[in-house]
């Protein structure tokens, strides 16, 4: 079923059709209208503005953002999902920049190889978003999903995305009859971010285990697994054996590092050692993610942690967390199930 949905969606995307992409209920829980940038027309942009009603944005890769000299909109991103907005832009030729034709003109420029940074003015009425390297396997957002769709379809990695809102101005949520009726009315295919995650996991890998060895860690004997990701960064998993080891749903603690084992300089020194005591007693996995995230932002890079768990053959797990309401997104796409959260 998932393969069929993704295959049909990719075929539609290649042919210039719009799709509805939905994320998990525990994330933004919304449906976005997405379109490959190279198929943008004034009519399609007008359709998004008229029927989807959300903010029209353009998702693209970090390399393209760099090429067009699009810096982050803010120096500190503290939005709920850390959506990577750049400065907004208009085509230099545009007058007001807001008409469907002029917004299309700006999008068209983002898709051309010959476009220069000077072809845009800032700020404007198109809002570029930078997709995270690794796509939905690194961050489970609409931004990454729409760029992944372009890459999988063999198209330039620029997508137009727009949130779908109801007529009363409220968000159309996953599970709403509104979204299914919207898809039926406009003959649009629907895809889930978790579908893309599953599809990519079946066809590629961002993470490979290259070392497994017995290693002493803070005076405790562990099994150490070392992984290499697509950016040539190392990530580590230490397996602890405890008196109450739960093999079916092991304890897991995710921890960010800035360099190899540079955990002592993180913001969570006390929490780290509290988690360590749990693992020594009950057994489980301590996973170091080389993501340069702060402790309170580790969820942003959960994709890497999920890939580590998948490589270790773990399906169900219990999470050691310093924040009970922290939400880990699109777990089903990784074949994972969080059965319990233990507060530190």
UniProtKB/Swiss-Prot annotation:
GO terms for biological process: riboflavin biosynthetic process. The keyword Protease does not apply. In the N-terminal section; belongs to the DHBP synthase family. Binds 2 divalent metal cations per subunit. Magnesium or manganese. Mg(2+) 1 binds at residue 28. The record marks 125, 163 as: Essential for catalytic activity. Mg(2+) 2 binds at residues 28, 142. It catalyses: D-ribulose 5-phosphate = (2S)-2-hydroxy-3-oxobutyl phosphate + formate + H(+). This is 3,4-dihydroxy-2-butanone 4-phosphate synthase. It holds the Pfam family DHBP_synthase. The lineage of its organism: Bacteria, Pseudomonadati, Campylobacterota, Epsilonproteobacteria, Campylobacterales. D-ribulose 5-phosphate binds at residues 27-28, 32, 139-143, 163. Keywords: Lyase, Magnesium, Manganese, Metal-binding, Riboflavin biosynthesis. Residues 203-344 are annotated as: GTP cyclohydrolase II-like. It comes from Helicobacter pylori (strain ATCC 700392 / 26695) (Campylobacter pylori). Residues 1-202 are annotated as: DHBP synthase. The keyword Metal-binding applies.
């Amino acid at each position: 079923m998932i393969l069929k949905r993704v295959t049909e969606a990719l075929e539609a995307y290649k042919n210039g059709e719009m799709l509805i992409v939905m994320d998990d209920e525990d994330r933004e829980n919304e449906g976005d209208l997405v379109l490959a940038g190279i198929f943008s027309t004034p009519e399609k942009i007008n359709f998004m503005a008229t029927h989807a009603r959300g903010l029209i944005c353009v998702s693209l890769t970090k390399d393209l953002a760099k090429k067009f000299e699009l810096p982050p909109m803010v120096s500190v991103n503290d939005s709920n999902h850390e959506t990577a907005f750049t400065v907004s832009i208009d085509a230099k030729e545009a007058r007001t920049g807001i008409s469907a034709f002029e917004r299309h003109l700006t999008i068209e420029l983002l898709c051309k190889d010959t476009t220069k940074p000077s072809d845009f003015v800032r700020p404007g009425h198109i809002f570029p978003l930078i997709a995270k390297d690794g796509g939905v396997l690194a961050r489970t957002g609409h931004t990454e999903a729409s760029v992944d769709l372009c890459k999988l379809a063999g198209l330039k990695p620029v997508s137009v995305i727009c949130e779908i809102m109801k007529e009363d101005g409220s968000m159309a949520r996953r599970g709403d009859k509104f979204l299914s009726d919207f898809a039926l009315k406009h003959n649009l295919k629907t895809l889930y971010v978790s579908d893309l995650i599953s599809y990519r996991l079946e066809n590629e890998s961002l993470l490979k285990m290259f070392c497994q060895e017995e290693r002493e860690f803070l005076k405790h004997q562990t099994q150490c697994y070392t992984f290499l990701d697509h950016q040539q960064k190392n990530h580590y998993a230490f397996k602890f054996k405890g008196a109450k080891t739960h093999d079916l749903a092991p304890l897991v603690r995710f921890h960010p590092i800035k360099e190899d084992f540079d955990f002592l300089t993180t913001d969570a020194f006390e929490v780290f050692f509290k988690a360590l005591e749990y693992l020594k007693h009950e057994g489980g996995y301590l996973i170091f993610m080389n993501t340069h995230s702060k402790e309170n932002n580790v969820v942003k890079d959960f994709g890497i942690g999920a890939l580590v768990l998948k490589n270790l053959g773990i399906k169900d797990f219990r999470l050691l967390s310093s924040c009970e309401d922290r939400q880990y997104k699109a777990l089903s796409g990784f074949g994972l199930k969080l059965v319990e959260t233990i507060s530190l």
